[in-house]
Swiss-Prot record:
It comes from Saccharomyces cerevisiae (strain ATCC 204508 / S288c). It catalyses: [protein]-peptidylproline (omega=180) = [protein]-peptidylproline (omega=0). CDD domains: cyclophilin_ABH_like. GO terms for molecular function: cyclosporin A binding; peptidyl-prolyl cis-trans isomerase activity; ribosome binding; unfolded protein binding. TPR repeats lie at residues 219-252, 270-303, 308-341. One of its GO terms (biological process) is protein refolding. Keywords: Cytoplasm, Isomerase, Repeat, Rotamase, TPR repeat. This is Peptidyl-prolyl cis-trans isomerase CPR6. Transmembrane segments: none annotated. Present with 18600 molecules/cell in log phase SD medium.
Length: 371
C-alpha cells in the first residue's frame, strides 16, 4: 500500500517560507489519514457549524506553538483552538494508538478528550511519550523540517501560545503517489541579501556548535550582511540581521573556548547590540534602543568608547520618548568617556532646551488649573 503525501505551503507574517510535506499512515490509521487528506484536498464540502466555511486547512493558521513541544493547527472555523470539524461530522473516534510519540516531526491528532477528533492536529518538535495512548499519530513530516523549526521558534503570546506573527497555511493539497523528496529539500535557502543561515544555530547543518570557527563564521557572515544593508540605508533589514546575530550569541555558551576566542565573542557582544541600537534609532523603535544600549553597558568587553556610544544612543531614545531627565543623565554620563564629542554635546543642549519647554508647559497647565 502506498502512503499518500500531502503538503502545506507556509507563510509567516505574510512572507512565504516554503512547503511542508507529510506522509500519512493510511496503512495503520486509514480513517484518520483520510480525514487529513480530504482536509488538505479541500473538496469535502462545507463546515456544519459555519456553512460558509469550506472543510479545508487552506487559509487557516498555526494557532498554538510551544517550543520544545509541538506546533498545533487545524481550527479553520474559529482560528483559536475552539473550532474545526472532521469530514465525518464534527468529531470522530480514536482509531488506535499503535504509533508512539517517540520522535520529532510526527503528525498527531489534537483532541478535547477520548474520541473527540476533529480537524485540529499538531506536529511534534521532540519525543512526547506522555501523549501516548491519548492522541492518535497518523503521519510524519518528510520535507520542510526546517520550516517546522522556524514555526517552533516564533515569538508567541505568553497567555495563549499563539504566534505574534500569523503562521498561515497559504495553500494545501495532495501530491502524486510517486512524489520524491528532493535531495536538497532541507538546505537553508539563501535570501535576497545572501544570508543562508537558519534562525537557530543548532538547527543549521553548516554549523557545528563544538567548532568555534563555524559559529564565528555564521555570526560574522550575517553581521556583515547587516552592515552592508545599513550602508544602503535599508535599516529594517540591517536590524533583522543584527538581531539574528544577537540570538546566535545568546544561544552559544561553550565552556572550553581559548582566551582569544572568548575575546572575539565578547567583542561581538558589544558591537552587535550597538548596531542594533543605531538601527532601532533610525527606525524609531526606542524600546529596542533602550534594551540594546543597556546590554552594552553591562558587557564585559565594553571600553570607554563603546560605553559612550551606548549612553549616547540610549540618551537619544529617552529624549524621543520625552524622558528628558533620564536622557540628560545618560548624555552627561557619556561625556565622562568622550568629553569633547560634538554630537553628545549637541544632544545635551537639545535635551536641556526640551526640558525647559516641558517645564514651561507644565507651569502653564498648573496656572490654568488654579486660575
Amino acid at each position: 500500500m502506498t502512503r499518500p503525501k500531502t503538503f502545506f505551503d507556509i507563510s509567516i507574517g505574510g512572507k512565504p517560507q516554503g512547503r511542508i510535506v507529510f506522509e500519512l499512515y493510511n496503512d495503520i490509521v486509514p480513517k484518520t489519514a483520510e480525514n487529513f487528506l480530504k482536509l488538505c484536498e479541500g473538496n469535502a464540502g462545507m463546515a456544519k457549524t459555519k456553512p460558509d466555511v469550506p472543510l479545508s486547512y487552506k487559509g487557516s493558521i498555526f494557532h498554538r506553538v510551544i517550543k520544545d513541544f509541538m506546533c498545533q493547527f487545524g481550527d479553520f472555523t474559529n482560528f483559536n483552538g475552539t473550532g474545526g470539524e472532521s469530514i465525518y461530522d464534527e468529531k470522530f473516534e480514536d482509531e488506535n494508538f499503535t504509533v508512539k510519540h517517540d520522535k520529532p516531526f510526527l503528525l498527531s491528532m489534537a483532541n478535547a478528550g477520548p474520541n473527540t477528533n476533529g480537524s485540529q492536529a499538531f506536529i511534534t518538535c521532540v519525543p512526547t511519550p506522555h501523549l501516548d495512548g491519548k492522541h492518535v499519530v497518523f503521519g510524519e513530516v518528510i520535507q520542510g523540517k526546517r520550516i517546522v523549526r522556524l514555526i517552533e521558534n516564533q515569538q508567541c503570546d505568553q497567555e495563549n501560545n499563539k504566534p505574534l506573527r500569523d503562521v498561515k497555511i497559504d495553500d494545501c493539497g495532495v501530491l502524486p503517489d510517486d512524489y520524491q523528496v528532493p535531495e536538497n529539500a532541507e538546505a537553508t535557502p539563501t535570501d535576497e541579501y545572501g544570508d543562508n543561515y537558519e534562525d537557530v544555530l543548532k538547527q543549521d547543518e553548516k554549523v557545528d556548535l563544538k567548532n568555534f570557527d563555524t559559529v564565528l563564521k555564521a555570526i560574522e557572515t550575517v553581521k556583515n550582511i547587516g552592515t552592508e544593508q545599513f550602508k544602503k540605508q535599508n535599516y529594517s533589514v540591517a536590524l533583522e540581521k543584527y538581531v539574528k546575530c544577537d540570538k546566535f550569541l545568546k544561544e552559544y555558551f561553550p565552556e572550553d573556548l581559548e582566551k582569544e576566542q572568548i575575546e572575539k565573542i565578547n567583542q561581538l557582544k558589544v558591537s552587535i547590540p550597538l548596531n542594533i541600537a543605531i538601527c532601532a534609532l533610525k527606525l524609531k523603535d526606542y524600546k529596542q534602543v533602550l534594551v540594546a544600549s543597556s546590554e552594552v553597558l553591562y558587557a564585559e568587553a565594553a571600553d570607554e568608547k563603546a560605553k559612550a556610544k551606548a549612553l549616547y544612543r540610549r540618551g537619544l531614545a529617552y529624549y524621543h520618548v520625552n524622558d528628558t531627565d533620564m536622557a540628560l543623565n545618560d548624555l552627561e554620563m557619556a561625556t565622562t568617556f568622550q568629553p569633547n564629542d560634538a554630537a553628545i554635546l549637541k544632544a545635551i543642549h537639545n535635551t536641556k532646551l526640551k526640558r525647559k519647554q516641558q517645564n514651561e508647559k507644565a507651569k502653564k497647565s498648573l496656572s490654568k488649573m488654579f486660575s
